[in-house]
Each structure stands twice: as structure tokens, then as C-alpha cells.
Amino acid sequence: MIPVIALVGRPNVGKSTLFNRLTHTRDALVADFPGLTRDRKYGRAEVEGHEFIVVDTGGIDGTEDGVETKMAGQSLLAIEEADIVLFMVDARAGLMPADQGIAQHLRSREKATFLVANKTDGIDPDTATADFYSLGLGEVHAIAASHGRGVTQLIEDVMAPYMDAEEPEVELTDEEENAAYWAEQEAQGEDVPPEDPEDDFDPRTLPIKLAIVGRPNVGKSTLTNRILGEDRVVVYDMPGTTRDSIYIPMTRDDREYILIDTAGVRKRGKITETVEKFSVIKTLQAIEDSNVVLLVIDARDGISDQDLSLLGFILNSGRSLVIAVNKWDGMTEEARAQVKDMLDLRLGFVDFARIHFISALHGSGVGNLFESVQEAYDCSTKRVGTSLLTRIMQMAEEDHQPPLVRGRRVKLKYAHAGGYNPPIVVIHGNQVTDLSDSYKRYLMNYFRRSLKVMGTPIRIQFKEGENPFAGKRNPLTPNQMRKRKRLMSHLKKGK
């Protein structure tokens, strides 16, 4: 399961700056659920291929004596729920009493904790971080979050336990090294699409992990019970009756599924127990662990900012998506028309997802959900050959030529599959990384229509070959050398 990293520390030590650096955002609003918990932000991050969920816990302004009360509630739960804690301190301000109080609490927890000294830019990091070793949390990692210095190395150290062990290097004989060298030279000299590797993976042999997510009391557990045909999940007419994600295996139409019923994302005003306040982490982890996400929306409450924030996290994770508008029964035709107009207005950016209008309580429309779930999963795991992708790319280029970049036409060479769930198309060419966003969207939509992909986002990646002449100066011919010599002589006489 994707690890969770919590950023803790005093106010103004740079937690939000590091959060923005890791999530590649400016305003720290990635997967932010307004009003859920004060000053808490959630984001999905990827650094050097390492994926994780990062949580900004807000400032903890505690003292050595009163840290337990200051860290109660949300901040305390954030530390308990996280897999890794980054305890951030201010290298310029030095060691403060609040830092000592927070460190004392962290030492009492069996949690992987890394001490991070921020704001070390422009100063000697060794001198600035010396006092922090007295906190008893081991090595001090010096970074400058505003400039990104030391951040990549920090994440590599933090994520080391979650990385696959590297395979030991195998020593080659002189004959094997010679053969490998010439094979590499031959491969570099050819500019041809790679052959499609043989893949014995059959996605139909694996159960489909279906995460049922949404705000509290939209009917997620009722829908789960309706699908299973039994009261497997405790249901009450009040938000927050499902506290932890529940994994339930099932079979439908000879197809194996694993249903993931998640704790809902709720507003701060409806929270009555502290244990309910951090269930959003369970939801985000369930999304990452799933193949298809079923987002349940309450037709009578409409689409809230929390729904859109959750939808944004689903899209960022690349998971397949099916939308269920629940509590459709009993609504007038006029009210239904208003809901459909609202869906068209606010969900236009996810036009690839199927939308179903259901009643989990009475079962109407529930049976059709699995057709869309199966379709979305099949589309996200469908294997497509290099020749077909290249042909689609060429047709897109013929219908609408790439724009000029610095006076030269962008050249698209070939395309191949780069991954699945979500489908990734890798396009090779010259200057492809300089393509405008509008043309990239055009290519993405063209591939979606041509491949008839529904229920899953599709991603386009661009790669361009190295220019063998980059950074090299052309040698002058003898004639050019003589002309240069005469010119330099003329310039000297002019002085």
C-alpha cells in the first residue's frame, strides 16, 4: 500500500513550502478537503519514481510541558496514522523549546521519524544543524525547501525501506562485455520503434479491486450491502458509521471482485469523535490500491467542493472511474433535470466516465454499474501494439499538423505503450517536449477516440532523442581559418 508521510513541526518552519515542492503545486490545494480539519492538506507526490501521500499537519505550537495537549486531536492522529514522520525544524531560528517538546513526544512513538532542518540556504548547514542532534532523533537532514536543495536525497533516504532490493551486479567475461558493447552500439544507431515484448499477463485472471468512495451518508455502505445481497456493513442514517476501509471479496457473473468500502470524507462541523477526523487517509490509500473507483454522489445534496476534491485525487492517481448518482428515487422530473444540468456543468472535464443514476436502497440501476466497471477495467488494461499506436499518431498528424517551434516543424516519429491502468502512450520525436498544451490535449483526445477508451484516463508522454551535435563546435575548414586570420589581423590594425 502506498506509504503516508506526515510533515510536523512548529509554525513557519517551511512545512507548506516542502508540501508544495513535493506535490508540484503552488497553493497547497491538491486533494485539499475544505473544512475537514483546520490547516490540513493532503497531496499525492512522486519523487524519482517513489509515490506516496504527503500530509501537511499544520503548525504545532507546543511547549516542553504542554506538548501533549497541543498535539492532541488532529495532529496527534496524523502522526499515528502516518507511516513516516518528517519532523521539520528551522535551521536559522535554531533549537526552540517547542522543538524539544515535539521531539519528546515523537521519541515515545514507534514511528519512523526523520529530523529535517529547513532553511539552510546561504548558511553553513553543519554549523546550523549541530544543536538539533541533542533532540535524540538521529541524523539531521539539511534541506532548503524553497529552492529544492536536498529534497530529492531526503525522499530517497525516507523511502529506502519501500524500495525493491536492487539485484546484485553480475560480472561479465571479456567476451560477453565485448558482445554487449557492440549490441548497444548497433541499437543506438537504429531509429526504429521497439518491438512489442511478449507479455503473458492476463488481467482477467486477477480480481478487480473496486473502491467505493464518497462523502459520508451518500449511501456507500448501503450500495455495498445491495451488491452483496446481505447486511455485511453496518449502516445507520448518520455520517461516519464506517470508520475503516473494509475489503470484501465477491463473485459476479463469473468475475471475481474485491469491494473496498471506505470511510467517507466529511465536513468539520459534522465530526463528533476524533477518530472520524482522519479517515480521509484511508480513502486515499484505498483509491491508490484499487483498479476502478466508484464515486458515489448524493443527488439531493448536489456536487460539493469535497466531491470535486476527491475526484481530483482520483484523476491524479490515474484510476478508472465510474460515477453513481445515488438517491435518485422519489425525485421529481424537474429536480432530476436540474441535477443533470448541474452534472453537465461541473463534471464536463470527466466526460470519459460513465454516469449512472441509482437507488442503493431500492436497488434500481445498481445492476448496470458492473457493466461500466468491467468496461473501465478492460479499457485500462487493454494491450495495444506499437504499430497501431504509431498509425493512430500518424493519422492525428495528418488531420492536424504539429505547430512550428522556433521556426521548425515538430516531427513525430513513432508511438508505443508505456504502461497500463492508466493506459500510457509514449510518443518519440524531435522537439516533442516543446509542444503546446492544446496540441497535447488534441493528441490525447484523438487516441481516446481511436482506441475507444471509456472509463479510464489516458496519459501521453513525450520523449525526444539526444542531439549528437549538441554542445559541439563545428571545426573550421582551412579556407575559413585563413579568412578568420585575415579578419583578426584587420581588427588589430584598426585599433
UniProtKB/Swiss-Prot annotation:
**TM spans (from-to):** none
- A Pfam family this chain is assigned to: MMR_HSR1
GO process annotations (BP): ribosome biogenesis
Occurrences of domain KH-like (ranges): 382-466
Check the record and name the InterPro entries matching this protein: G_ENGA (IPR031166), GTP-bd (IPR006073), GTPase_Der (IPR016484), KH_dom-like (IPR032859), KH_dom-like_a/b (IPR015946), P-loop_NTPase (IPR027417), Small_GTP-bd (IPR005225)
Query: What keywords appear on the UniProt entry?
Result: GTP-binding, Nucleotide-binding, Repeat, Ribosome biogenesis
- Write out the GO MF terms: GTP binding; ribosome binding
Domain EngA-type G, chain residue ranges per copy: 3-166, 208-381
Matching entries from CDD domains are given as: EngA1, EngA2
Q: PROSITE patterns in the record, alphabetically?
A: G_ENGA
Q: Where does GTP 1 bind?
A: 9-16, 56-60, 118-121
Q: Which residues bind GTP 2?
A: 214-221, 261-265, 326-329
Q: What HAMAP family does this protein map onto?
A: GTPase_Der
Q: What job does the chain carry out? A: GTPase that plays an essential role in the late steps of ribosome biogenesis.
* Family classification: Belongs to the TRAFAC class TrmE-Era-EngA-EngB-Septin-like GTPase superfamily. EngA (Der) GTPase family.
Oligomeric state and interaction partners are given as:
Associates with the 50S ribosomal subunit.
* The name this protein goes by in its record: GTPase Der
The gene name reads der
